[in-house]
From Swiss-Prot:
Swiss-Prot/TrEMBL keywords: Cell membrane, Disulfide bond, Glycoprotein, Immunoglobulin domain, Membrane, Phosphoprotein, Signal, Transmembrane, Transmembrane helix
Protein species of origin: Gallus gallus
Primary site of residence: membrane
Annotated segments matching region Disordered: 227-249
Positions of glycan attachment: 122
Name the UniProt record assigns to this protein: Myelin protein P0
Length: 249
């Protein structure tokens, strides 16, 4: 009897452990995403986007709920609800005539648009999504700032500065490459001219050498001719006295 009771107790503990292990896992909780802050100007419109991630398929019973907490207020009111395939705009608050549903549940999009913004719209908007059976999760909040003029964000200014610096660097690099290209091209032209001049000098020197190689025979012929003429003159001068003697006799 005692052994049977102990065995039944162990079986009960085992069943409890299995049931607890098969319970909902925190890793399967739904995750909702919205931007941290959104800016708008008085009289314009703004889109408050809301998306989510779920481990389950998109359910027919999916629901979106938007709440609004005005700046400086502790109370939060429901301003919009989507369920059973139909959007509902709550009568509470000043958004009834200025709100538009632009979401698409099949694309996990629960965005809304608020038209004709006013300073009273400053505050925090909360988006909550349920996708049965995935209903455990944390909602997401976005803060709306309504101003006379949309301020230039720090990121935009920084991006503009970085873009300007990169553009300046690109221009400097382009100028350097252009100057280098022009310099190399000029050097190539000068090199071709020098090569042509050197080639012309070589050709002229070759012609001069060929002329000089042809001059020695002519000089030798002129020397031989001058020698022959000199010898003939000497013979003539030697023979002239003898003829003179014959004439005297």
């Amino acid at each position: 009897m005692a052994l049977g009771a102990i065995g039944d107790g162990r079986l009960l503990l085992l069943l409890v452990g299995l049931l607890s292990a098969s319970g909902p896992s925190p890793t399967l909780a739904i995750h909702v995403y919205t931007p941290r802050e959104v800016y708008g100007t008085v009289g314009s419109h703004v889109t408050l986007s809301c998306s989510f991630w779920s481990s389950e398929w998109i359910s027919e019973d999916i629901s979106y709920t938007w709440h609004f907490q005005a700046e400086g207020s502790r109370d939060s009111i429901s301003i919009f609800h989507y369920g059973k395939g139909q959007p509902y705009i709550d009568d509470v608050g000043s958004f009834k005539e200025r709100m538009e549903w632009v979401g698409n549940p099949r694309r996990k999009d629960g965005s809304i648009v608020i038209h004709n913004l006013d300073y009273t719209d400053n505050g925090t908007f909360t988006c909550d999504v349920k996708n049965p059976p995935d209903i455990v999760g944390k909602s997401s909040q976005v803060t709306l700032y309504v101003l006379e003029k949309v301020p230039t964000r720090y990121g935009v200014v920084l991006g503009s500065i970085i873009g300007g610096v990169l553009l300046l660097v690109a221009l400097l690099v382009a100028v350097v490459y252009l100057v280098r290209f022009c310099w190399l091209r000029r050097q190539a032209v000068l090199q071709r001219r020098l090569s042509a001049m050197e080639k012309g000098k070589l050709q002229r020197s070759a012609k001069d050498a060929s002329k000089r190689s042809r001059q020695p025979p002519v000089l030798y012929a002129m020397l031989d001719h001058s020698r022959s003429a000199k010898a003939a003159a000497e013979k003539k001068s030697k023979g002239a006295p003898g003829e003179a003697r014959k004439d005297k006799k």
